[in-house]
């Protein structure tokens, strides 16, 4: 069995987030002052986690967020970030740069509702989901290949320290599962991956995990909580399990969804 952890973080706040302006892919807005503080708070929260791989969308707000996270890390300060366009936000076409209220008005005029409505030049939800699936399958193949190489050239079993570094910081509660499912007979994590992306993208990825992978989620979470947009720097953690040989889809367990305890005090205006 090959197991790995996937920690997904939304970028920090931008000025346009606060003003409820659609950014999508075409408006490459930097983080606001609050956004930088959120990224730093996320970094402090994750500072003891030993990530083996770090990926980010190639848009400015995610680049600045992942940098803010890693500069607080005890173990990952010098880690190379792989920027991937497949992690970009949903493309909103003509709605980019316009208020969210206008997007909702466009949807209403078309007899549809957000987020299912696709503005002209935008990306459909199915296209967004396929993009997320493509990245996830690439990631799985990368981890399986590296795990196979490590198994071939090293007699050492996967280390339990990757998992313990996660288990120590993610508190149990309403948004968290009760365990990482790591009993004595379960191998340690082969990898611990950090991904920094965007609100609509992460919501689509959650839908893929729920409907396609039949991922188990914390029982206390409602369907509406699973489909809501993550807060800025909200964190969602999955454990993926591949049976020996790595054939077929992995089984997936969600440890927590849109965790935001690290933001206590950060978002308060003085």
From Swiss-Prot:
Which GO CC terms are listed, alphabetically?
Answer: cytoplasm; cytosol; mitochondrial outer membrane; mitochondrion; nucleus
List the protein's name. Answer: Fructose-2,6-bisphosphatase TIGAR
Which SMART domains does UniProt cross-reference here? PGAM
InterPro entries for this protein:
His_Pase_superF_clade-1, His_PPase_superfam, PG/BPGM_mutase_AS, Phosphoglycerate_Mutase
Species name for this entry? Bos taurus
Show the catalytic activity: beta-D-fructose 2,6-bisphosphate + H2O = beta-D-fructose 6-phosphate + phosphate
Concerning CDD domains, the annotation shows: HP_PGM_like
User: Which GO molecular function annotation, any one, does this entry have?
Assistant: fructose-2,6-bisphosphate 2-phosphatase activity
Which keywords does the record carry? Answer: Acetylation, Apoptosis, Autophagy, Cytoplasm, Hydrolase, Mitochondrion, Nucleus
**GO terms of biological process kind:** apoptotic process; autophagy; cellular response to hypoxia; DNA damage response; negative regulation of glycolytic process; negative regulation of programmed cell death; positive regulation of DNA repair; positive regulation of hexokinase activity
Site positions per UniProt: Transition state stabilizer: 198
Record's subunit section: Interacts with HK2; the interaction increases hexokinase HK2 activity in a hypoxia- and HIF1A-dependent manner, resulting in the regulation of mitochondrial membrane potential, thus increasing NADPH production and decreasing intracellular ROS levels.
Which positions bear N6-acetyllysine? 50
The active site lies at 11, 89
Family membership, please give it.
Answer: Belongs to the phosphoglycerate mutase family.
Report the coiled-coil segments.
none
Query: What's its EC?
Result: 3.1.3.46
Q: Does the keyword Mitochondrion apply?
A: yes
Q: Where in the cell is it found?
A: Cytoplasm; Nucleus; Mitochondrion
- What does this protein's UniProt record list under function? Fructose-bisphosphatase hydrolyzing fructose-2,6-bisphosphate as well as fructose-1,6-bisphosphate. Acts as a negative regulator of glycolysis by lowering intracellular levels of fructose-2,6-bisphosphate in a p53/TP53-dependent manner, resulting in the pentose phosphate pathway (PPP) activation and NADPH production. Contributes to the generation of reduced glutathione to cause a decrease in intracellular reactive oxygen species (ROS) content, correlating with its ability to protect cells from oxidative or metabolic stress-induced cell death.
């Amino acid at each position: 069995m090959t197991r790995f952890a996937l920690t997904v973080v939304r970028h920090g706040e931008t000025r346009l987030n606060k003003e409820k302006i659609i950014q999508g892919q075409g408006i490459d807005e930097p983080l606001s002052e609050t956004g930088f503080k959120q990224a730093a708070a996320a970094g402090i929260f994750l500072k003891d986690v030993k990530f083996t791989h770090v990926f980010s969308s190639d848009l400015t707000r995610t680049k600045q967020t992942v940098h803010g996270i890693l500069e607080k890390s005890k173990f990952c300060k010098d880690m190379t970030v792989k920027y991937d366009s497949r992690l970009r936000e949903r493309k909103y076409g003509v709605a980019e740069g316009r208020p969210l209220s206008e997007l909702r008005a466009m949807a209403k005029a078309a007899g549809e509702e957000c987020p299912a409505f696709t503005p002209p030049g935008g990306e459909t939800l199915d296209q967004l989901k396929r993009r997320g699936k493509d990245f996830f399958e690439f990631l799985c193949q990368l981890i399986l290949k590296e795990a196979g190489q490590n198994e071939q050239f090293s007699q050492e079993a996967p280390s339990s320290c990757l998992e313990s570094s996660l288990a120590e910081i993610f508190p149990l509660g309403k948004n968290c599962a009760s365990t990482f499912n790591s009993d004595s007979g379960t191998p340690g994590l082969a990898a611990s991956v950090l991904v920094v992306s965007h609100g609509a993208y992460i919501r689509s990825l959650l839908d893929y995990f729920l409907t396609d992978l039949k991922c188990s989620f914390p029982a206390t979470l409602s369907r509406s909580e699973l489909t809501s947009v993550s807060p800025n720097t909200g964190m969602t953690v999955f454990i993926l399990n591949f049976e020996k040989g790595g054939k077929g889809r992995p089984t997936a367990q969600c440890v927590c969804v849109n965790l935001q305890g690290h933001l206590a005090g950060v978002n308060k205006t003085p």
